[in-house]
């Protein structure tokens, strides 16, 4: 028994890498309690300079029974008592979760990890107590969903979290080995009563399926972890092999060439599409969604405006390229009659916060990266509007163009046109931010001028 505990500590130290500042996600359960105790043992026994803190989320899940809140209070009291006894600084963050379109556990997990990310200090990494049983459950759930190698890779030992990292240093330990360690060291922990609820798939696997599998095949957990690691290796290899071509198929704006994809086999094309979407942090689409993306969006007629909704994202086609963006931000045009008056001081930097997550405009007499325009006269009212109409004559063009024709010639996608800020002096259009300056907005030599810059959110 001592040999197992010692081995666990040695492996734990190896899995921590070169980091020495840790924030432990501490729930008071077996996994996080053993993790915290193990860290303290490594620090004290090996005289290591480890900086250890703990964080506990005191959760209130809306639409849950009242006794659940009482359990949460009991867990908080236990965590505070344990950290006080071990002299570990504990940060407690209250969180309230209401599921919207997600299951309550998924919604809570999203909020929880955002809290963890915000709590991390400089050079600090987050540690969670996930173990081999958790990894096996993750792989089995991915198998149930029909996932490919990416999903079957399970949870990585290390992954990015905000500006830092998340480490799972106990992934190579079974829950049974953690329990033996806790019993040997006389460690107390709290069992989460929610873990007995078979309504959740993980609990069903944990309580009914894994015991059968490990009873029949004692090394099933280790074998599953090995398979997950092999799947992860294959995904890493594919990333390396396809990264150069994916880079070649992307424009500077991050759009993806349909013509380039069409030259690939279906298998390679799907792999490239998955990596493109993953690079944009989009939830991985199903095989059917990828097929629809190619047939209904990429191969649609040139005059059509098809799109595929993928969670909160939209994928659209324009001029032989695929575009991706959050639909909550870019799918809805700003009202054409919408107008914002801009208080303006010609001699200083002027800023205006735009509506609907569009960022802000800056206009300054000092040299900047923006468009050069003539300065407004004292009697001119400055405003920002949306929705270009009529004929417009812009710099660099001899003849005026109708707004629709002009947008087409400039290569502006249809869904972006009514979200581009238009700068007016009185009723005169001066510029479309980042796109063009009209002839009436020209900054002539020797006359006052300023610089217009659009800082997007």
From Swiss-Prot:
One of its GO terms (biological process) is tRNA modification. It holds the Pfam family TilS. This is tRNA(Ile)-lysidine synthase. The N-terminal region contains the highly conserved SGGXDS motif, predicted to be a P-loop motif involved in ATP binding. InterPro entries: Lysidine-tRNA-synth_C, Rossmann-like_a/b/a_fold, TilS/TtcA_N, tRNA_Ile_lys_synt, tRNA_Ile_lys_synt_N, tRNA_Ile_lys_synt_subst-bd. It catalyses: cytidine(34) in tRNA(Ile2) + L-lysine + ATP = lysidine(34) in tRNA(Ile2) + AMP + diphosphate + H(+). Keywords: ATP-binding, Cytoplasm, Ligase, Nucleotide-binding, tRNA processing. Belongs to the tRNA(Ile)-lysidine synthase family. Its EC number is 6.3.4.19. ATP binds at residues 27-32. CDD domains: TilS_N (cd01992). Its main location: cytoplasm. The gene is tilS. Ligates lysine onto the cytidine present at position 34 of the AUA codon-specific tRNA(Ile) that contains the anticodon CAU, in an ATP-dependent manner. Cytidine is converted to lysidine, thus changing the amino acid specificity of the tRNA from methionine to isoleucine. GO terms for molecular function: ATP binding; tRNA(Ile)-lysidine synthase activity. It is found in: Cytoplasm. GO terms for cellular component: cytoplasm. It comes from the Bacteria.
């Amino acid at each position: 028994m001592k040999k197992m505990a010692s081995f666990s500590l040695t492996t734990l130290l190896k899995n921590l890498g070169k980091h020495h500042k840790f924030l432990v996600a501490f729930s008071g359960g077996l996994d996080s309690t053993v993790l915290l105790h193990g860290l303290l043992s490594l620090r004290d026994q090996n005289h290591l300079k480890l900086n250890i803190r703990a964080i506990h989320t005191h959760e209130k899940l809306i639409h849950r029974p009242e006794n659940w809140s009482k359990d949460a209070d009991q867990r908080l009291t236990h965590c505070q008592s344990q950290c006080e006894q071990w002299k570990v600084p504990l940060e407690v963050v209250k969180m309230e979760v209401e599921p919207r379109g997600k299951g309550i556990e998924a919604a809570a997990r999203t909020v929880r990890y955002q809290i963890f990310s915000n709590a991390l200090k400089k050079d600090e990494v987050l540690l969670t107590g996930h173990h081999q049983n958790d990894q096996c459950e993750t792989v089995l759930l991915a198998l149930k969903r029909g996932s490919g190698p990416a999903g079957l890779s399970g949870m990585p030992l290390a992954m990015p979290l905000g500006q830092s990292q998340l480490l799972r240093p106990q992934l190579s330990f079974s829950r049974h080995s953690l329990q033996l360690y806790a019993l040997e060291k006389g460690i107390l922990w709290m069992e989460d009563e929610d873990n007995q609820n078979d309504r959740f798939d993980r609990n069903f696997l944990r309580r009914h399926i894994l015991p059968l599998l490990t009873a029949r095949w004692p090394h099933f957990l280790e074998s599953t972890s090995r398979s997950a690691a092999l799947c992860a290796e294959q995904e890493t290899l594919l990333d390396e092999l396809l990264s150069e071509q994916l880079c070649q198929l992307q424009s500077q704006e991050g759009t993806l060439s349909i013509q380039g994809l069409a030259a690939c086999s279906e298998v390679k094309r799907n792999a490239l599409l998955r990596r493109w979407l993953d690079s944009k942090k989009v939830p991985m689409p199903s095989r059917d969604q990828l097929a629809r993306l190619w047939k209904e969006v990429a191969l649609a007629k040139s005059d059509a405006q098809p799109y595929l909704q993928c969670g909160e994202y939209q994928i659209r086609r324009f001029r032989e390229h695929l575009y991706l963006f959050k639909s909550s931000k870019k799918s809805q045009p700003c009202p054409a009659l919408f107008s914002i008056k801009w208080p303006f001081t010609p001699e200083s930097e002027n800023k205006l916060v735009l509506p609907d997550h569009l960022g802000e405009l800056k206009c300054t007499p000092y040299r900047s990266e923006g468009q050069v325009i003539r300065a407004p006269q004292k009697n001119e009212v400055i405003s920002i509007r949306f929705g270009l109409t009529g004929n417009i004559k812009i710099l660099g063009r001899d003849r005026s163009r109708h707004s629709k024709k002009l947008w087409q010639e400039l290569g502006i996608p249809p869904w972006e046109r009514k979200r581009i800020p238009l700068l007016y002096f009185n009723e005169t259009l001066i510029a479309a931010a980042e796109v063009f300056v009209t002839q009436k907005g020209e900054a002539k030599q020797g006359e006052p001028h300023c610089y217009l810059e659009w800082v997007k959110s």
